[in-house]
Amino acid sequence: MREIVHLQTGQCGNQIGAAFWQTISGEHGLDGSGVYNGTSDLQLERMNVYFNEASGNKYVPRAVLVDLEPGTMDAVRAGPXGQLFRPDNFVFGQSGAGNNWAKGHYTEGAELVDQVLDVVRREAEGCDCLQGFQITHSLGGGTGAGMGTLLISKIREEFPDRMMATFSVMPSPKVSDTVVEPYNATLSVHQLVENSDATFCIDNEALYDICMRTLKLNNPSYGDLNHLVSAVMSGVTTCLRFPGQLNSDLRKLAVNMVPFPRLHFFMVGFAPLTSRGAHSFRAVTVPELTQQIFDPKNMMAASDFRNGRYLTCSAIYRGKVSMKEVEDQIRNVQNKNTAYFVEWIPNNVQTALCSIPPRGLKMSSTFVGNSTSIQELFKRVGDQFTAMFRRKAFLHWYTGEGMDEMEFTEAESNMNDLVSEYQQYQEASVSEGEEEYDEEAPLEGEE
């Protein structure tokens, strides 16, 4: 079967990763130590996309856990799903990267990277037909951003034809954890543009908003945020983990979602949104789900798609859903909101169905959108980057680890290029002839 190797790096990546494994081991009927006691054969049928089978009916996540300090790892090991993971797959240093991208990418991380690659190699060799890799990390810190992108490029070298998907937590406009976030994020995006096939952008602030506005949680914890992220990750990977009528894998998703190789940064959403404890008691319908996933308040990245246009998007429905109803609803959304979809990609909404809903819900739907409005996110980080870089603030931390200012300049211009590419396609129309516009312009005035 088509296996995926999962990597989680840094504190954020490990916490999101732990939440993800907790969610999907529950969906596949595994208990806290990986023993299968599920009810349906469907749970077993594609178990091996994410799990290796060990002796005694036990399943082990195909996960590699990486960090430059032992703290988070110990927490994961002591957590509810800590007994799931293979002990050899914990790879950690002692020094920490101290929120410094250069430490993660060039010094501390580079020393640990071969050890990680050995584990990755071992996991990949155990696969029948490796589909690709997914990595969870944040872009604002040192380990997840610096070492995470280092791992991505190393894995890219070794497995050039496998898919590389990343779940990347972007720095938020209002919620900032570290002062040097803009540096770390820009350097990371510079890497992701080149080396990732699909990047799902997640943003703490958008998650906070969802928790407070929709779930009515007054002071959400990271646990609540990670719960939302794991719901989306579970949704995006549903088609890989369960048989469905309209199935997709990482490559199909990428083929349908990425019109131009550099523009592979997606917004994600999930419906129905429920808080961790309470499952909704009302029946959800396909129209409701569809309306919810196309609602800007449901997006887990702090950019409003109404300021841009969708190049492509994909909706994954789970549960007992009628195919015709889904098709009608999606067509309905497209017809009513033609302004938000580029007209030079007809039928740019892809749908997938899977009959197994998440635990505790009758049906749910996950949304992945490639919208030009994601440029807001990069623009915001870019502005903060420029403000600091102009004064060369904090640069000595990076140059001290052997980085060159040139690299910062390159990263900055690469990100600016990305923003203008999104802008260019946002404004593009079907009849891309400049001279035609000039002829049409006076006509509008005459009417």
Curated annotation (Swiss-Prot):
Compositionally biased intervals (Acidic residues): 432-447
Binding of GTP, residues: Q11, E69, S138, G142, T143, G144, N204, N226
Cited SUPFAM superfamilies: Tubulin C-terminal domain-like (SSF55307), Tubulin nucleotide-binding domain-like (SSF52490)
Residue numbers binding Mg(2+): E69
UniProt xrefs under InterPro entries: Beta-tubulin_BS, Beta_tubulin, Tub_FtsZ_C, Tubulin, Tubulin/FtsZ-like_C, Tubulin/FtsZ_2-layer-sand-dom, Tubulin/FtsZ_GTPase_sf, Tubulin_C
GO MF, any single term: GTPase activity
Main location: cytoplasm
Keywords: Cytoplasm, Cytoskeleton, GTP-binding, Magnesium, Metal-binding, Microtubule, Nucleotide-binding
Cofactor: Mg(2+)
GO biological process: microtubule-based process
Top-level taxon of origin: Eukaryota
UniProt-annotated stretches for the region Disordered: 424-447
Location in the cell: Cytoplasm, Cytoskeleton
GO cellular-component term (any): microtubule
SMART domains noted in UniProt: Tubulin, Tubulin_C
Assembly: Dimer of alpha and beta chains. A typical microtubule is a hollow water-filled tube with an outer diameter of 25 nm and an inner diameter of 15 nM. Alpha-beta heterodimers associate head-to-tail to form protofilaments running lengthwise along the microtubule wall with the beta-tubulin subunit facing the microtubule plus end conferring a structural polarity. Microtubules usually have 13 protofilaments but different protofilament numbers can be found in some organisms and specialized cells.
Family: Belongs to the tubulin family.
Biological function: Tubulin is the major constituent of microtubules, a cylinder consisting of laterally associated linear protofilaments composed of alpha- and beta-tubulin heterodimers. Microtubules grow by the addition of GTP-tubulin dimers to the microtubule end, where a stabilizing cap forms. Below the cap, tubulin dimers are in GDP-bound state, owing to GTPase activity of alpha-tubulin.
Name this protein carries in UniProt: Tubulin beta chain
Organism: Cercospora beticola (Sugarbeet leaf spot fungus)
Lineage: Eukaryota, Fungi, Dikarya, Ascomycota, Pezizomycotina
